[in-house]
Regions:
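Active-site beta-loop-alpha substructure in enzyme catalytic cores
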Residues: 61, 69-87
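Structured beta-strand-rich core segments of catalytic domains in phosphoester-bond hydrolases
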Residues: 1-59, 66, 155-160
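N-terminal, active-site-proximal structural segment of metallo-dependent hydrolase catalytic domains
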Residues: 1-4, 16-20, 79-83, 174, ...
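Metal-dependent phosphoester-hydrolase catalytic domains
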Residues: 72, 86-97, 103-184
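Extracytoplasmic/periplasmic, Sec-exported soluble proteins
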Residues: 19, 43-46, 69-73, 102, ...
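Extracytoplasmic/secreted envelope proteins and their assembly/folding machinery
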Residues: 1, 24, 78, 82, ...
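Generic enzyme active-site microenvironment
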Residues: 63, 98-99
Length: 184
């Protein structure tokens, strides 16, 4: 964390990849109290997927990358995410945020299923594109707030990060970052 200017992180490995690992991660400037990664149900012929969860003093951040092959597999992955979050944080008063690449458009069955237990915080209208960074034409990346424990926060602002002072997003990722500014 010191080498990264005070940032800490946790990485959830989904699979080996080109001599390293492929998965999801969370970076934070706050002290991580606890963390865990769980394997999600795997769609037939698809890559392994995981949910990585980081608990901080005032809130919880979870991240995932859902299956890109099958909406049926995505439904099973959403069910598992909901089960894990309910089991671990159902009795907590901390807000639980879930972000990631859901490989699902706003009008998809997967997003409809998520909206039963989660509130989408990031822009997701007809022109709010997050993929691809080379030629954005669809919204598949979101940050959500879990409704299951009644925890509240105020959304101060949201943004799809199209402009940067430094760096080239088109070279850094095939996705455009999304941002939510919240107040507790």
């Amino acid at each position: 964390a010191r080498a990264m200017g005070g940032w800490d992180y946790r990485f959830g490995r989904a699979m080996p990849y080109r001599g390293g690992s492929y998965g999801v991660g969370v970076m934070t400037r706050e002290r991580i109290l606890d963390h865990f990664t769980v394997a999600l149900p795997r769609g037939e012929g698809a890559e392994p997927r995981v949910l990585t969860v980081v608990e901080l003093a005032r809130y919880v951040i979870a991240t995932t990358h859902l299956d890109h092959v099958s909406s049926l597999a995505q439904a099973g992955q959403v069910d598992e995410i909901n089960k894990v979050i309910e089991r671990e944080f159902g009795g907590s008063k901390k807000p639980v945020f879930l972000g990631g690449d859901f490989n699902a458009r706003p009008d998809s069955p997967t997003i409809s299923k998520l909206k039963t237990d989660w509130t989408i915080l990031t822009p997701h209208g007809a022109s709010d594109f997050t993929h691809s960074s080379q030629a954005p034409d669809k919204c598949i990346d979101y940050i959500l707030l879990w409704n299951g424990n009644g925890a509240k926060c105020e959304v101060v602002g949201t943004k799809i990060m199209l402009d940067f002072n430094k760096g080239d997003i088109k070279r850094a990722s095939d996705h455009i970052p999304v941002l939510v500014d919240v107040k507790f």
